């Protein structure tokens, strides 16, 4: 049999092992894995490289339509491809209107036409004003629903995202349980965080350490504990977003051990940045939950290696530079990190701390694909989409602003020495990024809908 592509001699991350083996691709799918696979139109030599499943980033904000001056599909998905991401799951907020019904998600589809370098699945929003319309988004094909129990959204904009109170969360979770959809939650106690933040501003406490102190660990833990119980009573599967503390992870682990259907994610910035670095970097490193101290970071690494965190995500949430101006308490909270997930975590987790390659593959791709039902993604296995990223180990470079593909070329990772490089990203058998050629093909990304899986 003749194939379209054979990748030879790479160390391939399979589900339970990593070994030097060849991969054959036909019609955008993985056709065979082994040795001496035969002929192909194209042969790639991956000697000395790690061949990983393309990253499935389960937490991305693109902001188009309505706020494409923050980030757009063209720039955002190019950055993703350059960073080794082949599939993103897009959040329902930052864009205007927020993705809360059939009409708003159709605007997303229209805005993305001809611009997707990678594939994309969508999340719907669970907000205070759409509980009777959740079925519309389920029918369209979203793979989950995001909500905030922390304060969010611009109250001066009618169609912006909104947080939910406990009653709205419970009613929404009941409906989503009936639909068989997971609910994803940003967990911080809204009343306490808001009050602590206002108190700090009144008293002129506006440093990074002050910001972190205004969103203490207990506000995350309390919110996780609360939504765990409400989701359990409502009969809804729960996914806890961007957990920032080991104590927060422990709540998820405890519930899981008791039989609850719950998963959680975290982000590279909670593992490689700490509060002192946040103070030095400034507003570019502001996010919520916040980047905490070094002791907290050590605890997060322990939880990650223990297998208590299901997947790593970017939570890419950029904004125009002027929204990052001023003191930390006033600046927009969100990190531009889409392009730096795979290489930073390969360096920090695999090269510096000895994480196994199969575990790395699960955290970056496989588990997210499983959690959100992306059946063709996340694995290097026959029949799956031929989505790969080539990683060059022990190849250090310093990230510069010019390296970035974002709408705004800023990131808290600029200036960082990263000890591994993404050299090639392949989507359904086609090279979409190459370190020498750039982006050699026109955007070929597609939307992934739940009912098409």
Swiss-Prot record:
PTM-bearing positions, type N6-carboxylysine: 146
Family annotation (CDD domains): L-HYD_ALN
Annotated EC: 3.5.2.5
Broad EC category: hydrolase
Assigned GO CC terms: cytoplasm
Residues the entry annotates as binding Zn(2+) 1: 59, 61, 146, 315
GO biological process, one term: allantoin catabolic process
Binding-site positions, Zn(2+) 2: 146, 186, 242
Key words of the record: Hydrolase, Metal-binding, Purine metabolism, Zinc
PTM characteristics: Carboxylation allows a single lysine to coordinate two zinc ions.
Cofactor descriptive note: Binds 2 Zn(2+) ions per subunit.
GO MF term set: allantoinase activity; cobalt ion binding; zinc ion binding
Co-factor requirement: Zn(2+)
Involved pathway(s): Nitrogen metabolism; (S)-allantoin degradation; allantoate from (S)-allantoin: step 1/1
Catalytic activity of the protein: (S)-allantoin + H2O = allantoate + H(+)
Job of this protein: Catalyzes the conversion of allantoin (5-ureidohydantoin) to allantoic acid by hydrolytic cleavage of the five-member hydantoin ring.
Subunit structure: Homotetramer.
Similarity comment: family membership: Belongs to the metallo-dependent hydrolases superfamily. Allantoinase family.
Name of the protein: Allantoinase
UniProt gene name: allB
């Amino acid at each position: 049999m003749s194939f379209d592509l054979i990748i030879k001699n790479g160390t391939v991350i399979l589900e339970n092992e990593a070994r030097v083996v060849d991969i054959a691709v036909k019609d955008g799918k993985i056709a065979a894995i082994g040795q001496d696979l035969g002929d192909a139109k194209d042969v790639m030599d991956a000697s000395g490289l790690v061949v990983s499943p393309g990253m499935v980033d389960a937490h991305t904000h693109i902001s188009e339509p309505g706020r494409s001056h923050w980030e757009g599909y063209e720039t955002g998905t190019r950055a993703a491809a350059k960073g080794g991401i082949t599939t993103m799951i897009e959040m329902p907020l930052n864009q205007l209107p927020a993705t809360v019904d059939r009409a708003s998600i159709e605007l997303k589809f229209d805005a993305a036409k001809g611009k997707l370098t990678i594939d994309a699945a969508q999340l719907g929003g669970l907000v205070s004003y759409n509980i009777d319309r959740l079925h519309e988004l389920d029918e369209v094909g979203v793979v989950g629903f995001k909500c905030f129990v922390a304060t969010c959204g611009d109250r001066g904009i009618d169609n912006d995202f909104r947080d939910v109170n406990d009653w709205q969360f419970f009613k929404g979770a009941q409906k989503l349980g009936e639909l068989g959809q997971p609910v994803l939650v940003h967990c911080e106690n809204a009343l306490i965080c808001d009050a602590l933040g206002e108190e700090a501003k009144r008293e002129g406490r506006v440093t990074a350490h002050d910001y972190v102190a205004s969103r203490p660990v207990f506000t995350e833990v309390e919110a996780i504990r609360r939504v765990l119980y409400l989701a359990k009573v409502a009969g809804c599967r729960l996914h806890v977003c961007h957990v920032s503390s080991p104590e927060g992870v422990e709540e998820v682990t405890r519930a899981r051990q008791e039989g609850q259907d719950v998963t959680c994610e975290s982000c590279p910035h909670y593992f490689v940045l700490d509060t002192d670095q946040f103070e030095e970097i400034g507003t570019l490193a502001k996010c919520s939950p916040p980047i905490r101290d070094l002791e907290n970071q050590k605890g997060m690494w322990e939880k990650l290696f223990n297998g208590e965190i299901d997947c790593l995500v970017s939570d890419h949430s950029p904004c125009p530079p002027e929204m990052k101006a001023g003191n930390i308490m006033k600046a927009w909270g969100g990190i531009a990190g889409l392009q730096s997930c795979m290489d930073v975590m390969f360096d920090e987790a695999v090269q510096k701390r000895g994480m196994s390659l199969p575990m790395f593959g699960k955290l970056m791709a496989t588990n997210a694909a499983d959690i959100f039902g992306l059946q063709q993604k996340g694995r290097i296995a026959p029949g799956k989409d031929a989505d790969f990223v080539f990683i060059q180990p022990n190849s250090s470079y310093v990230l510069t602003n010019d390296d970035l593909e974002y709408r705004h070329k800023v990131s808290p990772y600029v200036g960082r020495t990263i000890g591994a490089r993404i050299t090639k990203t392949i989507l359904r058998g086609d090279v979409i990024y190459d370190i020498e050629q750039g982006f050699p093909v026109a955007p070929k990304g597609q939307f992934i809908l739940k009912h098409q899986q």
